[in-house]
Design a protein with these regions (language model features):
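Cell-envelope/extracellular polymer assembly enzymes that use nucleotide-activated donors
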Residues: 111-114, 144, 284, 299
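Long helical/loop segments within the catalytic core of UDP-sugar-dependent glycosyltransferases
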Residues: 162-197, 209-294, 334-345
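Membrane-embedded multi-pass helical conduit in multi-pass membrane proteins
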Residues: 52-99, 103-105, 368-464
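Acidic donor-binding segment of Leloir-type glycosyltransferases
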Residues: 134-177
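Acidic donor-binding loop at a coil-to-helix junction in glycosyltransferase catalytic cores
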Residues: 294-300
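N-terminal signal-anchor transmembrane helix
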Residues: 79-142
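The conserved acidic donor/metal-binding loop of glycosyltransferases
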Residues: 202-206, 289-292, 304
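Catalytic donor-sugar/metal-binding loop of nucleotide-sugar-dependent glycosyltransferases
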Residues: 301-319
């Protein structure tokens, strides 16, 4: 017998009834809503002031000390890359399931799988995305798909409403509020999700057909503390221009070599912004994503590690559109690097607590992955310029800054270290069997200059406008 007007029955959740800023409200210490604490600001100002005084009083000794420290940092980063790439060869670096293993599961009852697709002003991608998700090899009645659209995004809403949505698909309108970010929209979708598992896809994504089934098998065959499995990402327009060639080489190295290596080492995984599959319950326990962090994926990967969970890599690919326009790429990379800066400051508010929760080894992984990569992008131009001045002009002043051991280590990093980083991109191309891109990977140092420019742009933006979300423009693939 049904109960009418049961006062204990919870009202159904709606987009306007849930709190998309739950993390910042309940755990402000884990949110980038405050980019830096007062203590962090004080320490930063004190370090910069101390450095300025040291340069004024002891310019040559200070420069020598900084150069020696940076050289040691480069040596450590080069060796670290060696360790990570070596670990990627481990058989447990990535979870694999053959078509035969998937077919052997049938007939079976598959769990309900929630899919979140945040979009903003992308009407040209709606039809492709709906068709791609509808064609995935997963029972139609077990898909819980939400197209997350901003309530004031009239053009994309119109495009979505013009389609006949398959069963299990629905449009969720996100009320307009600050901050206007992807993670805020995803938090609303998370509260309304009904599935046992949940995945994020971007508007232009083309996931492989059996990806959802592989994700289910990955969770079912992994230890209980595996809360996320990350699919590999790559691009379907690698040969559009030189920028997409460089971008594809970088992604191949990152998702096919470096992330599997980190997973094999049990390291904290900075998640990709798409195609990460979660246990919905655990994601809800962690209060979803930080709506104020512009690389909410990276931050969530760290929070998973701090909570005692792990992430595994899954051998399945989601194909995306690589940025083919220079300024769009700069904006996207600025956002990514700014998010890494946000993430580093958030989790370094209490370094001793972070060390205790992650453990010494994972704490070191965190510093090298989140802090080290960002730092190297910022200091690279300084050392490139010094190397250029030395080789062209051979000024005596520069030579005095590099005593024997520092010069030897610096020269090794300049030649051997840079070769290693280029070689990693070459290996990524080989792994993906995109041999034609290998010649372009040799020009990676030019790509690094672009990364350094966007890195310094990210630093400025972090202090001036930390929450701005410079959206990536899609739909730029040339039609054949």
């Amino acid at each position: 017998m049904s109960v009418v007007n049961d006062p204990q029955q919870a009202p159904p959740k709606t987009a306007s009834s849930v709190d998309p800023l739950e993390l910042s409200h309940r755990r402000p210490d884990w949110s980038a809503s405050q980019p830096m604490t007062r203590t962090q600001k004080t320490v930063t100002v004190a370090l910069l002031a101390g450095l300025a005084v040291a340069f004024l009083c002891w310019p040559q000794q200070t420069a020598r000390g900084l150069i020696a420290a940076c050289t040691l940092f480069y040596v450590i980063m080069t060796l670290y890359k060696f360790v990570v790439i070596r670990a990627s060869l481990s058989p447990n670096a990535i979870l694999r399931f053959s078509p035969q293993e998937i077919a052997a599961q049938e007939p079976r009852a598959w769990p309900l799988f929630s899919v979140l697709v945040p979009m903003y002003k992308e009407p040209e991608t709606v039809k492709q995305m709906v068709a791609s998700l509808a064609s995935m090899d997963y029972p139609a009645d077990k898909k819980d798909v939400q197209i997350l659209l901003e309530a004031d995004d009239a053009v994309t809403l119109a495009a979505a409403r013009a389609l006949t949505m398959p069963p299990g698909f629905r449009v969720t309108e996100i009320p307009a509020s600050f901050p206007r970010t992807k993670p805020k929209a995803c938090n609303i979708g998370l509260h309304l999700a009904e599935g046992e598992y949940l995945v994020i896809y971007d508007a232009e994504d083309l996931p492989e057909k059996d990806q959802l089934k592989k994700a289910v098998l990955a969770f079912e065959t992994s230890p209980a503390n595996v809360a996320c499995v990350q699919s590999r990402l790559n691009y379907y327009n690698p040969r559009q221009n030189v920028l997409t060639r460089w971008f594809t080489a970088e992604y191949s190295a990152w998702f096919d070599l470096q992330l599997p290596g980190l997973a094999a080492l049990g390291a904290v995984i900075p998640l990709g912004g798409t195609s990460n599959h979660f246990k919905t319950r655990i994601l809800q326990e962690l209060m979803g994503w930080d709506a104020y962090n512009v690389t909410e994926d990276c931050d969530l990967g760290v929070r998973l590690g701090r909570a005692g969970y792990t992430t595994r890599m899954l051998e399945t690919t989601t194909w995306e559109e690589a940025c083919s326009v220079f300024w769009s790429w700069i904006k996207q990379r600025t956002r990514w690097q700014k998010g890494y800066i946000q993430t580093w400051f958030v989790h370094m508010r209490d370094p001793l607590k972070l060390l205790k929760e992650l453990g010494p080894v994972n704490f070191l992984h965190y510093q090298l992955l989140i802090g080290g990569v960002t730092f190297s992008v910022l200091v690279n131009p300084v050392f490139w310029l010094m190397a250029l001045v030395w080789f062209v002009f051979r000024p005596e002043g520069v030579a005095q800054l590099f005593p024997g051991p520092v010069f030897a280590a610096g020269a090794a990093c300049l030649f051997l270290g840079n070769f290693v980083f280029v070689y990693i991109n070459l290996l990524g191309c080989c792994k993906r069997k995109t041999d034609s891109l290998m010649w372009w990977a040799l020009l990676t140092p030019l790509y690094w200059m672009m990364m350094s420019y966007s890195g310094w742009r990210a630093v400025i933006q972090f202090f001036r406008d930390p929450f701005v979300w410079e959206k990536t423009q899609h739909g730029m693939v040339k039609k054949s």
